[in-house]
């Protein structure tokens, strides 16, 4: 079984996200558990939490197939101690909110060195924050997303993700989310069965399929190794549908959330159908 959805709106309250997922025929979804462009937010209300859980059950969507995404403001690798602490505190707050909702995953971008410190120094700061966050919280798995390599963002090479995993004390609470657009933009080809196998064999050798906890399924507006993070609708970008056919039929991929972040939410329901039709045997 493939668990496919999109990053849906939680406007009006988190309880609305599963309703929006159900409208597009999803059996997985992503959401922000607070405003992604503000540092602080009022606590989740117990009524909203209860309604969220009820709506997930009504939509027949399991907590393990829901992928909360953290705030875009957070940079766990910030060179400035005070700004990194602000990011860390916001990160812990996000984990606690995810836990309150009864969810198991938190997807996040590793961080940026901002051309002020070395890549390794930045990665070490991120790992320190991850370990401290794990000590202060329970249950939630930290799911590191690969990046396109734009600007000073880290996480665009599999080796950088592996570096963070290696330095995480509790390996049971760390995983990876592969964003197909980001991977392609960072130089990992997925366009043919041969290219896909080469890239995923490298992923398995460097990181391991056992750490693959989620995927973002996005086509790409720019070509291979562009280092530009610009998503496109499935089959309308430089990746093409063959890449997604390979993913849908990759028996090494477990029952993880597969999330669309494509640019036209009016066709998400159609894109979910496209993905299901690409799967041989339609499991």
Swiss-Prot record:
The record's section on SUPFAM superfamilies has:
Xylose isomerase-like (SSF51658)
Q: What is this protein called?
A: Probable endonuclease 4
Q: Which gene encodes it?
A: nfo
Q: What Pfam families does the entry give? A: AP_endonuc_2
| EC number per UniProt | 3.1.21.2
Entries under NCBIfam families matching the protein: nfo, PRK01060.1-4
What Gene Ontology terms describe what this protein does at the molecular function level?
Answer: deoxyribonuclease IV (phage-T4-induced) activity; DNA binding; DNA-(apurinic or apyrimidinic site) endonuclease activity; phosphoric diester hydrolase activity; zinc ion binding
Which residues of this UniProt protein bind Zn(2+) 3? 182, 229, 231
For the ligand (Zn(2+) 1), the binding residues are 69, 109, 145
> Per its UniProt entry, what is the enzyme's top EC class, as one word?
hydrolase
The domain of life for this entry's organism is Bacteria
Substrates-to-products reaction catalysed: Endonucleolytic cleavage to 5'-phosphooligonucleotide end-products
